[in-house]
A protein has these predicted regions:
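Extreme N-terminal starter segment of soluble prokaryotic enzymes
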Residues: 1-3
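N-terminal strand-loop element at the rim of the active site
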Residues: 7-13, 26-64, 79, 151
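Conserved alpha-helical elements of sugar-nucleotide-dependent glycosyltransferases
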Residues: 15-23
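An amphipathic, basic-hydrophobic alpha-helix
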Residues: 60-88, 126-134
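Conserved acidic residues
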Residues: 86, 98, 142
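Short His-centered aromatic/hydrophobic patch
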Residues: 90-94, 102-104
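Membrane-proximal helix-turn-helix segments that form the acceptor-binding/catalytic region
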Residues: 124-152, 158-159
Length: 159
């Protein structure tokens, strides 16, 4: 299989990145072809996979995390159209994934209640909500690998 792995940022000290690394290594050991797309990579590149770093502009009016994630996703969609992948695996919530490795908590259930109701009018909320809904919403075709039953239940409560 030709697999596209998508992850906003890789750091050798992040639990999500370590999980990603183990999954990538296992896929390569089983003979699959892997292409990794990230916006930022810290550390060594594992052998056997192709890497594309889709950087955000260094000086940009869109410097916030949610805006950078949207820029990454837009660039990623262009790259994915250039090649035919059998499966697109995401380690962060974003539209267009075939498979999502669920390591993050539910944004709508966990983070949003911490803010006043007006927060839902912000670009940050709209961006993060749309990415989460693309994975967990009723119309989504994304397969989800959930890390725990509690996490699964939380997403089911909101989606």
């Amino acid at each position: 299989m030709k697999i596209a792995f998508c992850l906003f940022k890789y750091s050798p000290y992040s639990g999500l990145s370590l999980d990603f690394g183990r999954i990538l290594e296992e896929c390569l050991n089983r003979g699959h072809s892997a292409h990794v797309f990230v916006s930022e990579w810290q550390g060594e590149h594992p052998e056997g996979a192709q890497f594309t770093v889709l950087e955000s502009p260094k000086i940009s009016l869109k410097f916030s995390n949610h805006a950078q994630n949207e820029q990454f996703h837009n660039k990623l969609q262009v790259e994915l159209k250039k090649q035919a992948f059998d499966v697109v695996v995401g380690f962060n919530k974003m539209p267009g994934l075939d498979l999502y490795y669920g390591a993050d908590s539910c944004y709508v259930g966990d983070k949003v209640p911490q803010y006043p109701a007006i927060y839902k009018l912000t670009r940050r909320y709209k961006g993060r909500y749309s990415f989460e809904e693309a994975v967990f919403g009723v119309k989504s075709q994304t397969l989800i690998l959930s890390l725990s039953e509690r996490q699964k239940s939380e997403y089911q409560e909101y989606y």
